[in-house]
């Protein structure tokens, strides 16, 4: 239970990157979304019926009340958010019977090992479809033996973006950015996101293009001392601006102020910030991992490099100076609309559900 939230509208706003998918589905279907915060009751917003339920700890593993509520809805389709609930899936299937279709939506989880893997394989027999941001990610679960059939794996983005493109002059008026070569980082400062390799690669690039600036927005400062140490020791350290936290609504202006979005992630379930950046026409310079290949249409909408490879990052950053930015921006916006938007994700889920 998310105890810090006790108002339904505040919580729905907090999960807007997910809620927008349900709102699109609700335009054509009856949608019930079950949530758990410090509130109990029903709440209707944008045609989505939210059921806020409270459970004690044992109910997390043996969700009798939850399954009873689900059965009362008489659903045709149940979408479970997350792949790490095999016991709960088994109990739900027992409650619902065989007619209701169960779809599981992957959210960055890794395949279980040991006895948990056994339960995952058992639950797999009772699941009709899986949604992964990248089909290749789902196939890796099949290869490891956690899931049995590649036929159940479908490629559907995990989240979308509430942001949109606005005038760059307006955006820069808010952020105060005056530079022409603007790059943006949004994410945690941890080992997986690899800000160290990112900063090293950018500083190397900035030696060639001293007018280039990387703005870093973050809400986790795990590696902040290491980043500062890098910047203090480098002669071009002022090419990286450590912004810190930014309110979610302010990100609209940051994404629209930047020309390029930079990520150093070694693993992502999807890539929320990359998706948000693309919705604003900000071109991604990201690592060559499964989820980012899907989000960038195999690099067609951006530039890819190997995680942790400082020299390769510098090389692709040098390419950003030469490419046709207007054309790349157009490709970003077009691909976002057709594959990453709320309407595109909802359409994909509808098509999969209809095929079951």
Language-model region placement:
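Glycosyltransferase donor-sugar binding loop
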Residues: 186, 213-228, 244
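Nucleotide-activated donor-binding/catalytic signature segment of Leloir-type glycosyltransferases, i.e.
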Residues: 227-246
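A short, active-site helix/loop in glycosyltransferases that binds the activated sugar's phosphate group
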Residues: 37, 126-152, 160-162
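Conserved donor-binding/catalytic core segment of Leloir-type glycosyltransferases
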Residues: 176-193, 199-202, 215
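Conserved acidic donor-binding segment of nucleotide-sugar-dependent glycosyltransferases
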Residues: 298-299, 303-310, 318-325
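Short alpha-helical donor nucleotide-sugar binding micro-motif in glycosyltransferases
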Residues: 245-246, 253-258
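Aromatic "clamp/platform" in nucleotide-sugar-dependent glycosyltransferases that forms part
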Residues: 266
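Short hydrophobic beta-strand element within catalytic cores of glycosyltransferases
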Residues: 283-286
């Amino acid at each position: 239970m998310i105890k810090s939230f006790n108002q339904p509208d505040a919580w729905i706003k907090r999960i807007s990157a997910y809620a927008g998918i349900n709102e699109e589905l609700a335009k054509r279907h009856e949608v019930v979304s079950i949530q758990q915060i410090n509130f109990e009751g029903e709440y209707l917003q944008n045609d989505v019926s939210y059921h806020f339920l409270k459970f004690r700890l044992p109910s997390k593993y043996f969700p009798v009340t939850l399954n009873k509520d689900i059965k009362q809805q008489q659903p045709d389709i149940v979408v479970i958010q997350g792949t790490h609930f095999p016991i709960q899936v088994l109990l739900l299937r027992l409650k619902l019977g065989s007619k209701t279709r169960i779809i599981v939506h992957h959210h960055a989880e890794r395949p279980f090992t040991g006895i948990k893997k056994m339960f995952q394989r058992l639950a797999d027999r009772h699941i009709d479809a899986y949604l992964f941001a990248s089909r290749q990610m789902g196939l890796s679960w099949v290869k490891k033996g956690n899931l049995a059939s590649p036929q159940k794996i479908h490629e559907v983005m995990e989240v979308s973006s509430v942001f949109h493109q606005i005038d760059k002059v307006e955006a820069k008026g808010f952020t105060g950015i005056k530079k022409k070569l603007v790059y943006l980082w949004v994410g945690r400062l941890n080992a997986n996101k690899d800000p160290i390799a990112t900063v090293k690669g950018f500083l190397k690039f900035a030696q060639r293009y001293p007018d280039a600036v990387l703005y870093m927005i973050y809400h986790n400062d795990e590696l902040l001392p290491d980043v500062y140490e890098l910047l203090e020791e480098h002669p071009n350290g002022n090419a990286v601006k450590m912004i810190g936290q930014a309110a979610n609504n302010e990100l609209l202006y940051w994404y629209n102020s930047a020309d390029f979005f930079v990520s150093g992630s070694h693993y992502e379930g999807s890539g929320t910030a990359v998706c948000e950046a693309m919705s604003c026409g900000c071109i991604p310079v990201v690592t060559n991992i499964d989820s980012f290949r899907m989000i960038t249409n195999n690099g067609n909408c951006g530039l890819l490099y190997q995680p942790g490879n400082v020299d390769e990052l510098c090389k692709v950053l040098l390419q950003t100076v030469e490419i046709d930015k207007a054309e790349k921006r157009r490709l970003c916006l077009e691909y976002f609309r057709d594959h990453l938007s709320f309407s595109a994700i909802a359409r994909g889920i509808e098509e999969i559900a209809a095929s079951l």
